[in-house]
UniProtKB/Swiss-Prot annotation:
GO molecular function: RNA binding; structural constituent of ribosome
This protein's name: Large ribosomal subunit protein eL15
PROSITE patterns noted in UniProt: RIBOSOMAL_L15E (PS01194)
GO biological process, one term: cytoplasmic translation
Region (Disordered): 174-195
SMART domains listed in its UniProt record: Ribosomal_L15e
Sorted UniProt keywords: Ribonucleoprotein, Ribosomal protein
Length: 195
């Protein structure tokens, strides 16, 4: 017999065939009307949140972050010139959309650190991620040996330095040496070294 977490995971893997699909469609309508960064009482995907380190205790919060889909546009060009020369369309950012969602959540809660994040849905315009944030000065966090490392000063602002899972992926790290020779010490520093 499957555990409850396994059943939740399986229903998210085959979302369109599962019982939660009508609920998810209704969520998309309400989520689009809500703000871009919204604090939640409990995670939408409990199995995923727990596997990434979430605990239902003081010092942990869940935030839903909304980010645009697709390529980036610069602000509209005003004045006479050729748009082609100003790279208005088809900009490919070097950060993943998930990392942008994490950074926006961290901007909204400056006293907290991003632990991790996971995908919860998308509609025609936006992608939605839930971000796990930890209060680095909470006594419950400081006394927990599994997460007290986040209070260390070396982990301050970790999301802005690409130290979360989404950040590692964007930097081309996380799969050993093979295929990441030009990613160390960082992409920018490696470019300087090769000049």
């Amino acid at each position: 017999m499957l555990s409850s977490y396994s059943m939740i995971r399986d229903s998210w893997k085959k979302l369109k065939k599962s019982d939660i699909y009508p609920v998810q469609k209704a969520r998309m309508v309400s989520w689009r009307k809500s703000g871009s960064v919204v604090r939640l009482d409990y995670p939408t995907r409990l199995d995923r949140a727990r596997s990434l380190g979430y605990k239902a205790k003081q010092g942990f919060i869940i935030v839903r972050s909304r980010v645009r889909k697709g390529g980036q546009h610069r602000p509209k060009i005003m004045g006479g010139r050729r748009p082609r020369r100003l790279a208005y369309n088809k900009l490919t950012v070097k950060k993943s959309i998930q990392l942008i969602a994490e950074e926006r959540a961290a901007d909204k809660y400056p006293n907290m650190e991003v632990l991790n994040s996971y995908y919860v849905g998308e509609d025609g315009l936006y992608k939605y991620y839930e971000v796990i944030l930890i209060d680095r000065s909470s006594p419950a966090v400081l006394s927990d040996k599994n997460v007290s490392w986040i209070a260390n000063s070396a982990n301050k602002g970790r999301v802005y330095r690409g130290l979360t899972s989404a950040g590692y992926k964007s930097r081309g790290l996380g799969h050993g040496r093979l295929g990441s020779a030009k990613s160390r010490p960082s992409i920018r520093a490696n470019g300087r070294l090769r000049r």
